[in-house]
């Protein structure tokens, strides 16, 4: 857990310094080279600030990666364990008709503090 927080703190510090570097105009040299290379090469290879992800999108990706794994969605669709027809049809060998009605209405009870 501590290593995750250390990684987040390091990333925040890097993003903070990255924002200061952008304000200082560190992209000037890259833009000059991108303008010189525009001739035979497509513009997708030019290294310009528009193509770089914003700090907000980087933070969103980081937070999504740190989310705890959730329960499998199939867990919500478990078959009913109690109530009428929970165990399928009754055979003659199992219970009498009166007992069958009684046990078909059985439901789990919650014991403890209310």
UniProtKB/Swiss-Prot annotation:
Region (Disordered): 29-51
Record PTM Phenylalanine amide, positions in chain: 82, 111
Main location per the UniProt record: secreted
GO BP term, pick one: regulation of membrane depolarization
Annotated compartments: Secreted
A single GO cellular-component term on record: neuronal dense core vesicle
Signal peptide span: 1-21
UniProt keyword list: Amidation, Cleavage on pair of basic residues, Neuropeptide, Secreted, Signal
Keyword ATP-binding: no
UniProt entry tagged with the keyword Signal: yes
InterPro entries: NPFF
Removed propeptide positions: 22-69, 85-100
Main function: Morphine modulating peptides. Have wide-ranging physiologic effects, including the modulation of morphine-induced analgesia, elevation of arterial blood pressure, and increased somatostatin secretion from the pancreas. Neuropeptide FF and SF potentiate and sensitize ASIC2 and ASIC3 channels.
Family: Belongs to the FARP (FMRFamide related peptide) family.
Protein name (database record): Pro-FMRFamide-related neuropeptide FF
Upper classification of the organism: Eukaryota, Metazoa, Chordata, Craniata, Vertebrata
């Amino acid at each position: 857990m501590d290593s995750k927080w250390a990684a987040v703190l390091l990333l925040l510090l890097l993003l903070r310094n990255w924002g200061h570097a952008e304000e200082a105009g560190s992209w000037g040299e890259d833009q000059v080279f991108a303008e010189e290379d525009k001739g035979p090469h497509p513009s997708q290879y030019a290294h310009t600030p528009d193509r770089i992800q914003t700090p907000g999108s980087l933070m969103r990706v980081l937070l999504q990666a740190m989310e705890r794994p959730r329960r499998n969605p199939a867990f919500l669709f478990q078959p009913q364990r109690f109530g009428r027809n929970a165990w399928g049809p009754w055979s003659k060998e199992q219970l009498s008709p009166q007992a069958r009605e009684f046990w078909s209405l059985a439901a789990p009870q919650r014991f403890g503090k209310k």
